[in-house]
């Protein structure tokens, strides 16, 4: 990759969302996890039960994983119970484990609480990136709250096994980019008959093992700004409905193109990273709201070089980047 980055094989540890047996799952709903012992409703048992906090994990569904952030407005307070065979009954309250053992023993054909946990639970319980591939545009969040992902179609990437050059911000930028979503879509077309095709698409996507300082500086500041903005304004809706967030994602996509297509971007005079060093979001003296507002105003000026290069993408790279950048709207 000519100065910007060196790409290589993705050797990180990746695990899939958990799988279920007989379409049943061990879940408590409407939980209040503020105390060490909390109460939740079990639909399977049709009653409320108490459980120790450390025996449960917060549960993420596809609708709760948005680009860069967990959409708390869609979070229904569901928790997954860890149905481990080596957990003694004393660890659970209200005879919950005993009840589940009886159901599992006598009613296997209609109901089962048996849970196939991730092969590497330490990945799920440690800081990680959760990638959702269930929609045309993939979404990625950084998680430190020990969420378990549901269903299959959501994947956890161990943060500790990624190359050291990949900061939290750059990893979020890559897996929320149109380039990655486009790659996943094309990979699935070619390998659609293979098992675990989503998993294979993530593992086969090359990742940087070196990124120059200018790229790192711009992407770290850019992603920090959009994460803070999305956390405060997630209820606005998708990027299509939020014009400011939409244009921030445009900037991120352009940076990722330049990371992966450095020579092509340089040859066609489409690079934006150096120009973004002068953008308002790089000003550490501004708060998040001002960074977003001033960057948007800066980008909307007709003589803005970055804006012009985004608009020229379709003509200067009609066979490559235009196809990637516009696939979602076809």
For the regions a language model picked out, list residue spans one by one.
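Polybasic, glycine- and aromatic-enriched phosphate-binding surface used to engage nucleic acids
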Residues: 1-218, 330
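Non-catalytic DNA-recognition/assembly elements of restriction-modification systems
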Residues: 8, 92, 96-102, 209-330
